[in-house]
């Protein structure tokens, strides 16, 4: 197996493990996430009594009710965002993927702390904002 392929696999596996660890480290917030995890949050979502973000609220309810799902969903989404960005930017040129993947990771990890807290440090915010960005990137990839 060529050295470039091994390096690419190592970087991908390492970043997946890193993002799963980050997802495991995200606590539930007392003001919002706990409410989504209780029966009241489920009633809110089923009744459509909130903000109209039905898909995002669905992810918030599921991630707040099941901690293992939270870790997997957040970790995989955090990993897939730079992965899909790099796939889109590489435009099929395999040699460009790894540098682009590292640059996309750097861009995400170096975002301002206030933005990081709202998107990655808040489970309900993650379900509403980051998951939708992932679906948008997947849609762009399908259109390409």
List where the protein language model places each region.
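Short hydrophobic/aromatic helix or loop-helix immediately within or flanking a transmembrane segment
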Residues: 46-82
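Alpha-helical membrane-inserting segments
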Residues: 59, 63, 85-89, 140-143
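Membrane-embedded transmembrane-helix bundle of lipid-linked glycan/lipid transferases
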Residues: 7-15, 78-84, 141
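Transmembrane-helix motifs of polytopic, lipid-linked glycan transferases
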Residues: 76-100, 104-108, 138
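Extracytoplasmic catalytic/substrate-binding loops of multi-pass membrane glycan-assembly enzymes
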Residues: 21-39, 46-59
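Membrane-interface micro-motifs in multi-pass membrane enzymes
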Residues: 53, 105-144
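Transmembrane signal-anchor helices characteristic of membrane glycosylation enzymes that use polyprenol
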Residues: 6-30, 107
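Short, Lys/Arg-rich, polar N-terminal cytosolic tail immediately upstream
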Residues: 1-4
């Amino acid at each position: 197996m060529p050295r470039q392929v091994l390096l690419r696999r190592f970087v991908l596996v390492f970043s997946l493990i890193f993002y799963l660890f980050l997802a495991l480290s995200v606590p539930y917030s007392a003001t919002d996430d706990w409410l989504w995890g209780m029966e009241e949050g489920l009633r809110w979502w089923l009744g459509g009594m909130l903000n109209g973000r039905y898909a995002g609220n669905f992810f918030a309810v599921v991630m707040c009710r099941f901690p293992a799902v939270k870790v997997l969903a957040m970790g995989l989404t955090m990993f897939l965002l730079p992965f899909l960005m790099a796939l889109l930017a590489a435009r099929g040129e395999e040699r460009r993927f790894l540098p682009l993947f590292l640059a996309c990771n750097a861009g995400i990890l170096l975002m301002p702390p206030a933005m990081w807290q709202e998107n990655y440090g808040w489970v309900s915010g993650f379900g509403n904002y980051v998951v939708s960005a992932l679906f948008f990137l997947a849609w762009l990839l399908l259109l390409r």
